[in-house]
A protein has these predicted regions:
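Metallocofactor- and cofactor-centric catalytic cores in central/energy metabolism, strongly enriched
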Residues: 1-407, 414-417, 422-494
Length: 494
């Protein structure tokens, strides 16, 4: 199999491997179609005549329209296809009420926190409240590596440039994100490291935290002590003693929270990796667990796939408001809503934002959507959640971590080395990338395109890897020491 027609209603097929000019392809319901030109892997070929202005249909949905008459066998891409997207949309709620049959959950070997939550890692996190102390945090983290022993699995710091010279909602958003990170169950202990004179004050962080475990969350203002390294190591040593009391134990998979993300997508993302991840999401939800889908701009053009699965009118209204609110965000900055596909996306076969979005939302599987979370919000309802956040890889995976995700499933057709604070599994879309960047890979979904595994079989394999990762198996990014954050900024710099 070297091509696929994703939906019987599609007027295109996708090349699973490079298709040479003159190659004949049998298309169900159409007959034989001969490639009129070379079709790169992941790219689209017309299987029917399409008149100028008519829609290109893929995934059973329009992904744009052709700019001129198209004949069967022609290559369809950015040179002859244009988006249909514009601004806000008045969405209608047409509920489908999908049902996920419950399944008895397996267990993974995790940590049980004092407040009853489950964790997949047992770490200490140093969170700077301002960029001025990033290097202090780095030195403090390096000095604290001697504390990593027994059940304490790591000490990490998360540098960023913010926390000062911000105002209003932008400043509040940074503060909420940092506090949300501190609540993550994988952090057995947290040190908020401040300078002492920044806008993101100690009192503001305390107010944002509300009621919290004062043994687990500690503070240090560098301007208040003679030697911040000595004081910092003392605090981290105390947190390490607390963390080492935790031991791995069996925990039901119903307590897992997984994040769903894609980056560096290609034309196979929506055919191999993303639907595999979507099936894993459904498996987690069926076991009583939680999954979180973000990247709002990469839902544009595929909204109905998600909105019709909202479990209630209230959830639908919140989702519709989030989608249109994000479009307003673009427009308020003088940007059009559809300029999303990157050069790498286009090189891999993604033509329009609708094309990208229809593939992106495959990660959400088929479960009902139970809640809509703001940026820096935490998932509290079991089932599939939507999270407000941009498409940017590091910003959105940071938001997924802040939402409480224990493991993040990250599909990519181009490859990327980074890792979020939460374990980040890289799911590759194609065999070529697996061969080229094996050191970045955790799971090869390219086996779906080659026919070695079905989607269901690949999903079973990936789900087992999720359980192993939750039980302590390191991801590729963790093995390479990648633990990074990026904060969504939307405001002036003083």
């Amino acid at each position: 199999m070297n091509t696929i027609q994703i939906n019987p209603a599609d007027n295109v097929i996708v090349a699973l491997s490079p298709l040479a000019k003159g190659t004949a392809v049998a298309v169900p319901g159409v007959g034989e179609v001969v490639a009129a030109e070379d079709i790169p892997q992941g790219h689209k070929m017309a299987v029917r005549a399409i008149a100028a202005g008519e829609d290109v249909v893929k995934y059973g949905l329009p992904i744009g329209h052709v700019m001129g008459d198209i004949q069967p066998g022609q290559w369809l891409h950015t040179h002859n296809v244009k988006t249909n997207l514009s601004g806000e949309v008045e969405y209608a709620y047409n509920p489908t009420h999908p049902v996920v049959e419950p399944v008895e959950p397996e267990t993974f070997m995790g940590f049980r926190r004092a407040d009853g939550r489950a964790a997949t890692r047992n770490e200490l996190w140093i969170i700077p409240t301002v960029g001025c102390v990033n290097e202090v945090a780095r030195a403090m983290c390096e000095q604290a590596q001697d504390l990593v022993e027994g059940s304490l699995e790591g000490v990490y710091y998360f540098p960023h440039p913010f926390g000062c010279s911000q105002t209003g909602a932008d400043h509040a958003q940074t503060r909420r994100l940092l506090v949300a990170l501190s609540r993550h169950a994988n952090a057995a202990g947290v040190l908020f490291l401040s300078l002492g004179c920044e806008n993101c004050t100690h009192q503001q962080v305390l107010d944002e935290l509300g009621d919290f475990d004062r043994e687990r969350v500690r503070f240090l203002a560098c301007q208040d002590v003679a030697d911040e390294q000595v004081e910092g190591h003392k605090i981290l040593s105390e947190l390490a003693d607390l963390a080492k009391q935790a031991k791995r134990e069996p925990i039901p998979a119903s307590e897992l929270v997984i994040g769903l993300k894609c980056g560096g997508s290609d034309g196979l993302s929506g055919i191999t990796a993303n639907p595999t991840i979507g099936r894993v999401s459904d498996m987690v939800v069926a076991r009583g667990g939680t999954s979180v889908l973000t990247e709002v701009p990469e839902m544009f053009g595929a909204e109905s796939i998600l909105l019709d699965r909202c479990e209630s009118q209230d959830v639908f209204n919140a989702a519709a408001d989030m989608l249109n609110g994000f479009k307003d965000y673009f427009i308020s900055h003088g940007e059009v809503v559809y300029e999303n596909p990157s050069p790498g996306n286009k090189d891999g076969g993604i033509t329009t934002l609708e094309d990208k979005s229809c593939g992106c939302v495959q990660k959400g599987g088929s479960a009902p959507i139970v809640d809509v979370l703001p940026y820096a919000g935490q998932a509290t309802k079991h089932g599939l959640n939507m999270l407000c956040g941009p498409g940017n890889d590091m910003v959105s995976t940071t938001a997924l971590t802040a939402a409480g995700c224990h493991v993040i499933l990250f599909s990519t057709g181009r490859g990327t080395p980074f890792g979020a604070p939460a374990p980040t599994l890289k799911v590759f879309t194609n065999q070529r990338l697996c061969d080229h960047k094996a050191n970045w890979m955790d799971f090869n979904a390219g086996v779906v395109a080659t026919g070695e595994r079905t989607l269901d079989e690949a999903a079973h394999d990936l789900y087992q890897l999720v359980l192993e990762t939750a039980s302590g198996k390191l991801t590729s990014a963790e093995r390479r020491g990648c633990h990074e954050i990026s904060i969504w900024k939307d405001g002036v710099c003083l």
